[in-house]
Amino acid sequence: MSSILNILPALAFLLILLSISAYIQRTSKENRQKDFAKDYFIGGRTLGGFVLAMTTAATYSSVSTFVGGPGVAWVIGYGWLYMAIVQVVVIFLVLGVFGKKIALIAREIDAVTVIDVLRARYHSDFLANMAAVVIVAFFCATMVAQFVGAAKLFEAVTDFSYLTGLTMFGLIVVIYTTIGGFKGVAVTDACCAIAMIVGLCILMGGMMHAGGGFNKIMSYISTQHPDMLEPLSRGKMPISLYISQWLLVGICTLSLPQSVVRGISYKDTKALHNAMIIGTVVIGAMTLVATWIGVISKGILTGPITAYGNSVDNIMPIAIVQSLTPFWAGVIIIGPIAATISTVSSLLLSSSSSIVKDVYMNIKGKREEQLSNNQIRLYSLGATIILGLLVYAIAIKPPSVIWQINMFAFGGLETAFFWVLIFGLFWPKANKYGAIAAMGGGVIIYCLAMVFKIKVLDLHQIVLGIGLSLLCFFIGNSFGKTVDEKTLRIFFPEKFDDEK
């Protein structure tokens, strides 16, 4: 009986999200009858600043925010926290660099997805289809890993099995994403972001109490592990790791399609500006507090890593169990579950839009076979359900290499879209051959570098992927011509202002 009571907070939270999504489905019925694709995939471009900020922050945060990151901080110390500071500017970068421009372009060409924008800019179905394949492949790998990570944490903190946790939040997120669409995902993401912040605050209080207070914890760390107070952690946090992580989880994240699409969905400039401010504060609070909790947990889990299963992923689950009562541990589990489902819901919706909107509807359009609004609705809902259930099924018995595959995802998406978006939106001379070479060549190079553990100057493979992707872009671009003037007027209207 007590075990059931321990998971009631998490179950109640999931049911609230499901109810919100069902409510949004009902209130959006009229808009979906007019243009289902626009309302379902980007919420009809009606997001306000607060929801835009929270959904972007929640999408960026994942189960690693609660498990992997703090676990590494337990080993390295404040050096990992200093590295994590770069993540504070992530939302400011995404919305600041791409937000306004991509919103104006999307309204001009009636784009619903990032791939719509790329297709209109480069006039290449091959590039658009390649982008769709990249998105679906990497997103599915990420979603499986998110499910696996959260379910394992659920199993460690509660008395319930891995499958129970996976089923409880896995199926609910598939259902509420399917019925709520983008607007439902955005609003529930906002709820998830709030839940994550509250969970981190409770966990921080529990950690401090269990460790005897901040002064006692820091006294132990400074005496027993003084290296944890140093920026380089006596070699465990080299400069090359700082540079690699600042690129991987900082600068290059501005090109992640699941974040960029948020720039298509807001209602006005005021919402964008508010989101940049609110989002920066929220992502900063979540990332830095979570990482700091990992550092101070060293004062609670004082044994060697071999005492905790020889894995940093076990640190936070064990710390939660040792720091909190079963009930509060059940409340805390809402945080990582919220981080998981907010990420999965966004990736799931983006994946289904890539299949239905970017590939299938485009093929039909080329054949002059227009789909009815009802057909679009059925195909979109069907794709979301099928993808979601597929990810859930794989997560039940995940392949042993899934964590290695997940490592590809973040850097792979950045390598694929970084230069394609940057040059596409800010360099008039960029053409489809450069974009195809950068995306295809960059992803292949990055994946090969990851598989064979190839590094340059001990930097993460993202540096090699991004660097050679840039080279591929320039080489490919030299074989093509600049796009037509009509396209340039849409994407670079400032170049033609003198003619008015």
What is each of the regions a protein language model found here?
Residues M1-K500:
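Membrane-embedded helix-loop-helix hairpins and adjacent transmembrane boundary segments
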